[in-house]
Amino acid sequence: MAKQIEFNDAARKSLEAGVDRLANAVKVTLGPRGRNVVLDKKWGAPTITNDGVTIAREIELDDPYENLGAQLAKEVATKTNDVAGDGTTTATVLAQALVKEGLRNVAAGAAPSALKHGIEVSVEAIAGRLLENTREVAGGQVASVAAISAQSPEIGELLAEAFDKVGKDGVITIEESSSMVTELVLTEGMQFDKGYLSPHFVTDHERQEAVLEDALILINQGKISSIQEFLPLLEKTLKASKPLFIIAEDVDGEALSTLIVNRLRGNLNVVAVKAPGFGDRRKAMLQDIAILTGAQVVSPEIGLSLDQVGLEVLGTARRITVTKDNTTIVDGAGTDADVADRVSQLRAELERTDSDWDKEKLQERLAKLAGGIGVIKVGAATEVELKEKKHRIEDAVSSTRAALEEGIVAGGGSALVQAAKALDENAEVKALEGDAVTAVNLVRRAVAQPLRWIAENAGHDGYLVISKVAELPDGHGFNAATGEYGDLIAQGVIDPVKVTRSALRNAASIAALVLTTEALVVEKPEEDESDSHAGHQH
């Protein structure tokens, strides 16, 4: 396949244009007065959202060079979403500002490598200051963090209640409700850190997860490689017309191939995952899952082999969600008495053990068995509203978890503007020379852009707001919802510091790559067959 190459300024301008087009679509959603973006879907109703990463994922540009820039900006949003679960719009706006300011300096003759070094040192200084300004989350602030992310005080209260019930490490899942009411339901369930063995098992491609409703559960202690030993049970499962969830030491070879083929042909909705843990701990965790789901572990140790067992060894659960990293089982069919017995047994083991490591692992297993799962059932009048609301609640869950992990800073873009004061005080920043000093001022201007767009989207003069906020004490800033200045933390306008730091670092990482790019290589578009025969007489 022939390639096209673009060099120097032309290459960097194309990247900038691509970053701009994506960022301009995303930044209109920033802040409490941000607008929505409507995404066309090939089938079904369009999606209305204000979630940066959801918008970014949909964008592909015609121009192959510009598209490279858009994909880099998309990477900023995706990476921030993976680490912090929110802050994707802020990250995109920061990346756009750093790229724009940086390329202006490169065009004026600044050395890209010096700018890159200056950006990295400056960003670390600001990230460090953000950590210094962090406050721990107090009781009522959980609702504030969630409410800001979801743009709804009611959802904020609901999530505060959910985290209160399941704890900061507890599992919260989001489901669609058949009614118009959004409610919290506490249920028995478990999550463990193993994902699907093949992406072919995915049922929801937008969210890259496999969801099984009312599924049968096979728990096998050993490997499943041969289809022969597995076939009798597979045929019985097919007759039961229910989805099948398999947990085993591993599933590979022809067994995995057969499952994938049946899944792709639509014969059987199936997902396979590796068993969590190692050695004796793995056996114990499989037994925990078996008790929770009413299954029996298939193991030669107790005289059971795959080719001899029937549906009676399978457990069931109302819903199982599997991502590439995690599995969540909700409402297993195990009896309350069996689960309570297992919990008592684990507590007794916990009291007997002296090993810190064993204690930690037993605590984890206890939390999984006894902690339960908070299920938020999302209700809305239409399917379009339901999807939009679900996106907001997902963001809010991630944001709240991030706040509970690392603490909070003032929201509304103010924390970044005030943390930029570190650029005047940090020893490493002061030691910079030449074009690296230019990068310091470039970063100072760039970190003010989220505040600018939050203000502009609310109908205020962004640059005027920036100059006022820069003079206010830490923790004070501009509340775009009311249009007033004040103590943002007291007013509940707060952001998780993890979200703000991740957004800044990821934006700087991509901006540094763009500034030091000298050539772009893309595939040459194929000529249309009808064009190549144009003018020929037949």
Curated annotation (Swiss-Prot):
Subcellular location(s) of the protein: Cytoplasm
List of residues binding ATP: T29, L30, G31, P32, D86, G87, T88, T89, T90, G412, N479, A480, A481, D495
Cysteines engaged in disulfide bonds, as pairs: none
EC identifiers of the protein: 5.6.1.7
Keyword Kinase listed: no
One BP term from GO: protein refolding
Keywords recorded for this protein, A-Z: ATP-binding, Chaperone, Cytoplasm, Isomerase, Nucleotide-binding
Catalytic activity: ATP + H2O + a folded polypeptide = ADP + phosphate + an unfolded polypeptide
Pfam families per record: Cpn60_TCP1
Family according to the record: Belongs to the chaperonin (HSP60) family.
Self-association and partners: Forms a cylinder of 14 subunits composed of two heptameric rings stacked back-to-back. Interacts with the co-chaperonin GroES.
Descriptive protein name: Chaperonin GroEL 2
Gene: groEL2
